[in-house]
A protein has these predicted regions:
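ABC family nucleotide-binding domain
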Residues: 4-231
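C-terminal boundary and immediately downstream tail of ABC-type ATPase nucleotide-binding domains
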Residues: 220-221, 228-251
Length: 251
């Protein structure tokens, strides 16, 4: 079996006296779509933010595509490893976080130009293709303020893909959208999942998406992965009463 593209070992995260993550261990294979779900406060978003070190773990080790970083005091070498790890991860947030003063195409091109130091012609061609992939090529020269929430989130997905990450992290990407706009973002994510080109870790309460797209589901409870399995396993016969109670409440 090939090495996992994401490996998390003994991950702990505390904020003061509050322990939010209590020892997470998980391996995720290339091309896998892992849906993380659970009640508010169970540690889902903190888990994602620790993977790309937007939150610094209190304890544990994280490996993404061969770049391994352990918890500890910041050092020059560790900061370098974190920068390398982040180039392998793209992240889509609840809020779109697009640069309001930049056109859509410039938002998508920014990281490959500034961080990746790639040639402008190549970056522009790739960015236009990414916008076409998410159905936004006709809005390339618009500014974010002129877009709907669903359109902005689709641009945010294209922007995250522009650095050609090996892992995409989605932190409740539809939670800030009006109900009628959710489907357009989920459709883009489904096409990305169907391509099997990118590993996806998705925090969401959209159980229809999970049932259709996920290769694995992980139920977070009280800072731990209480149960994991295929959608068929968890929807039809969850082993934990907590998992069953949660699914009964949201389905």
């Amino acid at each position: 079996m090939s090495a996992p593209v994401v490996s998390v070992r003994n991950l702990h995260k505390s904020f003061g006296d509050l322990e939010v993550l209590r020892g997470i261990d998980i391996d995720i294979a290339s091309g896998e779509v892992v849906v993380v779900f659970g009640r508010s406060g169970s540690g889902k978003s903190t888990f994602l933010r620790c993977i790309n070190f937007l939150e610094d773990p209190t304890q544990g080790e994280i490996d993404v595509a061969g770049i391994s970083v352990a918890a500890g005091l910041p050092t020059r070498q560790r900061r370098k490893q974190i920068r390398q790890l982040r180039t392998r991860c793209g992240m889509v947030f609840q809020q779109f976080n697009l640069f309001p003063h930049m056109a859509v195409i410039d938002n998508v091109m920014e990281a490959p130009l500034r961080v990746g130091k790639e040639p402008q012609k190549e970056v522009r061609e790739r960015s236009l293709q990414l916008l076409a992939d998410v159905g936004m090529s006709d809005k390339a020269d618009e500014h974010p303020i002129r877009l709907s929430g669903g359109q902005q989130q689709r641009v945010a997905i294209a922007r995250a893909l522009a650095m050609r990450p090996q892992v995409m992290l989605f932190d409740e990407p539809t939670s800030a959208l009006d109900p009628e706009l959710i489907h357009e973002v989920l459709a883009v994510m489904k096409r990305l999942a169907d391509s099997h080109s990118t590993t996806m870790i998705v925090v969401t309460h959209e159980m229809g998406f999970a049932r259709e797209v996920a290769s694995r589901m992980c139920f977070f409870h009280d800072g731990r992965i209480l149960e994991q399995g295929t959608p068929e396993q968890l929807f039809s016969a969850p082993a934990s009463p907590e998992t069953k109670r949660f699914l009964d409440a949201v389905i």
